[in-house]
């Protein structure tokens, strides 16, 4: 639920750049580029890893369908961490992300899925949203709000 980059930066050197690349490739996660061994603690933040919105949706769809090369235990541990919000007959799973660069526009992500048990539009809705971050203080909170409004607009979530 919280961004814990420092934990990931402690773990990734133990895994190694080559193994991380192998997992990302097996997941079909964007270009799966972890860069050089020196990039192992930043490849997803400021490094060469990139993913499009469509690729993100494809990855999340595989995650939702349990169609990634992961154990049942891994799914059982990972999916609840993404639970962001619940309602009477729905659960919203989501994660934020932020790409920051000195050379390019900062980009904020909000990705996940909605499990809807009833209402006007039952089913699972996978989403990936990114936006340019001009003013972090105001733009960062707009990501979840924009996605939530889109889900309301298509009838997948009730209006607040």
What do the predicted segments below correspond to?
Residues 1-3:
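Short helix- or helix-capping micro-motifs
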Residues 6, 24-29, 51, 87, ...:
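Extracytoplasmic
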Residues 8-65:
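Mid-domain, small-residue-enriched loop/turn segments at the edges of structured enzyme/sensor domains
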Residues 13-16, 59-160:
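Structured C-terminal helix/loop/strand segments within mature extracytoplasmic catalytic/sensor domains
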